[in-house]
Amino acid sequence: MAKEKFSRNKPHVNIGTIGHVDHGKTTLTAAISAVLSRRGLAELKDYDNIDNAPEEKERGITIATSHIEYETENRHYAHVDCPGHADYVKNMITGAAQMDGAILVVSAADGPMPQTREHILLSRQVGVPYIVVFMNKADMVDDAELLELVEMEIRELLSEYDFPGDDTPIISGSALQALEEAKAGNDGEWSAKIMDLMAAVDSYIPTPVRATDKDFLMPIEDVFSISGRGTVVTGRIEKGIVKVGDTIEIVGIRDTQTTTVTGVEMFRKEMDQGEAGDNVGVLLRGTKKEDVERGMVLCKPKSITPHTKFEGEVYILTKEEGGRHTPFFNNYRPQFYVRTTDVTGSITLPEGTEMVMPGDNLKITVELINPVALEDGTRFAIREGGRTVGSGVVSKIIA
């Protein structure tokens, strides 16, 4: 049976859920899908379906990013449910990079928690431009004053990280109650709150101006081998357009390779082309699965080149933000997360700078052990021992 063609009749926006573990991110994702499915705007995905990677079952926490799609009257959304647990912040960095806006889930019963702060900070770092807040578990809070207090705390926290806290839409509700209502076939007050949330997302998160006219670039997230068809790489197209038949390069980590695109798919539907913002699978002619890995990029030939040495403008987190407690010195060797990969690199401090304190903002020179596709403006996170200690942006390529 031929695959159904993907229709592009509404503006497309990438969003996702972020927030502290157990505040209800996955339940909210399921509730949105359930409430919208009653209006014919989504396929119903239940909680277990969204929370479905094998590792999660043992620990009861979400690890992999789950993608679901749904529509409102105005838009088509691709929604990622981001991992919440601190151990999996690494995935959050690659997941959050896929969002035009985020729904921050905060339990009204608990208020903002350490990971709430960390996810707001990460959103700032990886360039999530807009946040809408869902104050979950409001059914567990009887005191209206307490709700107001939590709302104030959330607004202050957003403002602290340069998000417009005072203007951010905050909708309170209960994802679990809405999910139960929708499953029972009812449209009650809790489902109405989900519709309020989607209305806020529709109006507050602008339709992104897609970088479709720039040169094609797609960071590789995953690589699959499909028997009889070849190698498929998946990821979100960062900019430009890719068409079936295009000649493209695979850049980073190893020597640059050239290949031809033989297929483009989105949500299991075939397309003639993929464009900036789309989460796609790209079929590559004659490329072996072992020649490609996460962290490489697909790009228009000669448009971006692999580099190992650059200058970057960085901010080093304070210990309160979850960063280092102590300074670091010249030749410090952390991991650099660029797009979808981590590469070890050494930091050279500017002349006259002996050490860097948590909270400092400075220009550094970085030398990576493996080449990565880089250009001015490429963002990266600095991590060590499983936690983010800094964030930065490439200001100048050296080699």
UniProtKB/Swiss-Prot annotation:
It comes from Campylobacter fetus subsp. fetus (strain 82-40). Belongs to the TRAFAC class translation factor GTPase superfamily. Classic translation factor GTPase family. EF-Tu/EF-1A subfamily. It catalyses: GTP + H2O = GDP + phosphate + H(+). Mg(2+) binds at residue 26. The gene is tuf. This is Elongation factor Tu. One of its GO terms (cellular component) is cytosol. Residues 136-139 are annotated as: G4. Residues 19-26 are annotated as: G1. Its EC number is 3.6.5.3. Residues 81-84 are annotated as: G3. The lineage of its organism: Bacteria, Pseudomonadati, Campylobacterota, Epsilonproteobacteria, Campylobacterales. Its main location: cytoplasm. Residues 10-209 form the tr-type G domain. Residues 174-176 are annotated as: G5. GO terms for molecular function: GTP binding; GTPase activity; translation elongation factor activity.
